[in-house]
């Protein structure tokens, strides 16, 4: 089925996303001190960090697959993808901390998967969180990933008929 093909494509990109993340971590931990800056402190919950990165990568990849399924050409998909990520990042608290926004916008932030990803990463890096403190964010991100994946699969299946 097409869902199997989508899963195969997603597996590759999830691994790629995770590699990118861990390369950036290594740069923060190893390269920053060489430049005279403080080393990145990644906390102590390595398993929780790995699982969080896996779930965030799966959600991001599922969103990319959804965009690729909805649009028929890269020229259609690329602008939408870029603009939608900028909007979701603004809504989700990437630009401005959600805590300083009005109550209504704080609720709106919860509609962005980027909000939940940032919250999980901040919990692990800044608040020395564990899997017990990020499980809610990971479940919500998995829900987003599942919805994106199902819509992509249904869209592509209908297109192939």
Task: Annotate each predicted stretch with a short phrase.
Residues 18, 102-103, 155:
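Residue-level detector of alpha-helical segments with a strong bias toward transmembrane helices
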Residues 80-84, 109-112:
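Central hydrophobic cores of alpha-helical transmembrane segments
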Residues 129, 153-154:
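Short secondary-structure boundary segments
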Residues 154-161:
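Short cytosolic juxtamembrane segments of multi-pass membrane proteins
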């Amino acid at each position: 089925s097409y869902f199997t093909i989508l899963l195969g494509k997603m597996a590759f990109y999830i691994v790629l996303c995770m590699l990118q993340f861990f390369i950036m971590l290594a740069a923060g931990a190893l390269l920053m001190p060489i430049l005279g800056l403080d080393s990145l402190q990644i906390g102590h919950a390595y398993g929780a960090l790995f699982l969080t990165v896996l779930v965030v990568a799966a959600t991001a990849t599922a969103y990319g697959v959804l965009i690729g399924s909805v649009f028929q050409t890269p020229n259609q998909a690329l602008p939408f993808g870029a603009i939608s990520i900028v909007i979701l990042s603004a809504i989700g608290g990437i630009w401005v901390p959600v805590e300083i926004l009005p109550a209504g916008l704080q609720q709106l932030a919860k509609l962005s998967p980027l909000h939940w990803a940032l919250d999980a990463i901040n919990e692990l890096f800044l608040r020395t969180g564990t899997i017990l403190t990020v499980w809610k964010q990971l479940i919500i991100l998995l829900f987003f990933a599942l919805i994106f994946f199902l819509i992509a699969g249904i869209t592509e299946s209908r297109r192939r008929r």
